[in-house]
Design a protein with these regions (language model features):
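A short, hydrophobic beta-strand element within the central beta-sheet of small alpha/beta folds
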Residues: 75-78
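Conserved dinucleotide-binding and phosphotransfer motif residues
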Residues: 25-26, 73
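Charged docking surfaces used in two-component/phosphorelay signaling
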Residues: 17-25
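The short loop immediately C-terminal to the conserved phospho-acceptor aspartate in CheY-like receiver
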Residues: 56-57
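Acidic, metal-coordinating helix/loop segments flanking the phosphotransfer/catalytic sites
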Residues: 32-51, 69
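Short acidic/polar segment at the start of the alpha1 helix of CheY-like receiver
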Residues: 12-16
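Non-catalytic signal-transmission and effector/linker regions of two-component phosphorelay proteins
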Residues: 1-7
Length: 78
């Protein structure tokens, strides 16, 4: 059975690692992005993402902007 993919987006490496480690222990496949722009790149490269865990305050593009952009294409839970 394929593991569900979760995209974790946070500009703080420690937070991404903490969330990633927890999710991997629960047998999820974790994709990471360090800012909003990178999050969109990862999202559009992997259309089978089951969930996005998204920080709101990030450089380049904040979480609200990312959420609006993704919502125009998908109803993936954020």
């Amino acid at each position: 059975m394929d593991r569900q993919k979760i995209l974790v987006v946070d500009d703080e490496n420690r937070m991404r690692k903490l969330v990633k480690d927890f999710l991997q222990r629960e047998n999820f496949e974790v994709l990471e992005a360090g800012d909003g722009s990178e999050a969109l790149d990862v999202f559009f490269a992997h259309q089978d993402i089951a969930l996005i865990i998204l920080d709101v305050m990030m450089p380049k593009m904040d979480g609200w902007q990312v959420c609006r952009e993704i919502r125009s294409y998908s109803k993936v839970p954020i």
